[in-house]
Amino acid sequence: MISTVQDSLEGHFHVLTPIKLNLALHIVGQRTDGYHLLESLVYFSLSGDCLSYAPCERDRFILTGPFAKGLSCNSINLAVRARDFMHKTFPRSAKPSSFQLMKTLPVASGIGGGSGDAASILNILRQKWKLDCSCEELAEMSLALGADVPMCLFALEYQQPLFVKGIGNDVTRLEEACSIAMVLVNHGQKIATETIFNALEKRNHPPLKINPVALKTVSSLVEVLQETRNDLFIPALKIAPQLAEVLSTLDESGSLFSRMSGSGATCFGIFKDQQAAQKAAAFIKSMHPNWFVKSIITLGRSSQ
């Protein structure tokens, strides 16, 4: 399933790509090839970048939007690599495509923007080319594009939060997890994921223990999160001390629980409902007009 925003013309449509949020992230080891082993509670919102697709005679990729500056339309861009990956993997089914990506999410911000874009392109082409390939099969193959791409594919397919282990390839769907209202805040400093992982002083932290039953309501979820961590926060804070101000601002705006997502620098706050989240987002934006602030609703069951 894809989050379809518009289907105005045959074959032409727009989707909003997934935002990935690590509500908890425990680093529990490291493989000999350098990949870190993690355990993470991951939620998603289909309110990210805007991706437009249309069939065409020759491949085309266009970048626009407030966060497109400095990005390229070549193989350095993960979204372009995803398109090229599909051409190489399914040459007999491949057809030219035109993609326009409006970047509305900060780059290098710990919310999987690039991975969500890539997963959306994989998912679109799987459907448009009518491939005899399941989401699970494509997710396994797409690990070559990055550890976050498979989980974003699963988010598009199943519309549920996930418990993720290993290097991102061991995924469990959390079917009972409720949808939550959140506010995302980014103060503007880019943080390279590799830099944060290299700065880790310890790579064998205690595992993440989550009882799926506790994810059914916002209040019980918040209680569970109090006993979890983001093991990347301490090294990120040393690089970007402004993170402390962001988290403090979220708390002041009424957040029930605030934390940095992934390797940063985006932080999130959990709120009791959408109205509270929207009110908090407006408050934070008025106080810090240069910050990225976004109110979202995550995928999941209704908690009502």
Curated annotation (Swiss-Prot):
Catalyzed chemical reaction(s): 4-CDP-2-C-methyl-D-erythritol + ATP = 4-CDP-2-C-methyl-D-erythritol 2-phosphate + ADP + H(+)
Positions that bind ATP: P106, V107, A108, S109, G110, I111, G112, G113, G114, S115, G116
EC number(s) recorded for this UniProt protein: 2.7.1.148
Gene Ontology biological-process annotations: isopentenyl diphosphate biosynthetic process, methylerythritol 4-phosphate pathway; terpenoid biosynthetic process
Keywords: ATP-binding, Isoprene biosynthesis, Kinase, Nucleotide-binding, Transferase
A Pfam family reported for this protein in Swiss-Prot or TrEMBL: GHMP_kinases_C
Entry annotation: catalytic residues: K20, D148
Molecular-function GO terms, alphabetical: 4-(cytidine 5'-diphospho)-2-C-methyl-D-erythritol kinase activity; ATP binding
Keyword Nuclease listed: no
UniProt cross-references to InterPro entries, sorted A to Z: GHMP_kinase_C_dom, GHMP_kinase_C_sf, GHMP_kinase_N_dom, IspE, Ribosomal_Su5_D2-typ_SF, Ribsml_uS5_D2-typ_fold_subgr
Pathway(s): Isoprenoid biosynthesis; isopentenyl diphosphate biosynthesis via DXP pathway; isopentenyl diphosphate from 1-deoxy-D-xylulose 5-phosphate: step 3/6
Function of the protein: Catalyzes the phosphorylation of the position 2 hydroxy group of 4-diphosphocytidyl-2C-methyl-D-erythritol.
Family: Belongs to the GHMP kinase family. IspE subfamily.
Official protein name in the record: 4-diphosphocytidyl-2-C-methyl-D-erythritol kinase
